[in-house]
Amino acid sequence: MARIAGVDIPNDKRVVISLTYVYGIGLATSKKILAAAGISEDVRVKDLTSDQEDAIRREVDAIKVEGDLRREVNLNIKRLMEIGSYRGIRHRRGLPVRGQNTKNNARTRKGKAVAIAGKKK
């Protein structure tokens, strides 16, 4: 397994897919990285030379990934909560942030349904 940005990426998969195991790199970013490094998308990770791995590492180092990206996202959410914006309040209350209805659904965000006493028929 090759190690890129502190993540072990699978050997048997194509490089373009393996790079998506790094937090912050999706398929589109993965393709851009490989194009900039001059590596084919069809190559398997186990077939990469050390020079190619170094080229990929250099390209990934220029992008904000893993811990830095997670920290930035968490700080952005914390900032929204501190300034008291609508989105920050929704984060604080554990409700959907992007305008979804909450009358019937939103169970993923709200958690397990709480039974109301005296509601039996």
UniProtKB/Swiss-Prot annotation:
UniProt region (Disordered), positions on chain: 96-121
Keyword Ribonucleoprotein in record: yes
Basic residues composition bias: residue spans: 106-121
Intrachain disulfide bonds: none
GO molecular function list: rRNA binding; structural constituent of ribosome; tRNA binding
A biological process from GO: translation
Domain of life of the native organism: Bacteria
Pfam families reported in the protein's UniProt record: Ribosomal_S13 (PF00416)
Keyword tRNA-binding: yes
Record keywords, A-Z: Ribonucleoprotein, Ribosomal protein, RNA-binding, rRNA-binding, tRNA-binding
GO cellular component labels: cytosol; small ribosomal subunit
Role of this protein: Located at the top of the head of the 30S subunit, it contacts several helices of the 16S rRNA. In the 70S ribosome it contacts the 23S rRNA (bridge B1a) and protein L5 of the 50S subunit (bridge B1b), connecting the 2 subunits; these bridges are implicated in subunit movement. Contacts the tRNAs in the A and P-sites.
Family of the protein in this entry: Belongs to the universal ribosomal protein uS13 family.
Subunit structure: Part of the 30S ribosomal subunit. Forms a loose heterodimer with protein S19. Forms two bridges to the 50S subunit in the 70S ribosome.
NCBIfam families attached to this UniProt entry: uS13_bact
Alphabetized PANTHER family for the sequence: 30S RIBOSOMAL PROTEIN S13/40S RIBOSOMAL PROTEIN S18 (PTHR10871), SMALL RIBOSOMAL SUBUNIT PROTEIN US13M (PTHR10871:SF1)
UniProt-recorded name of the protein: Small ribosomal subunit protein uS13
Originating organism: Streptococcus suis (strain 05ZYH33)
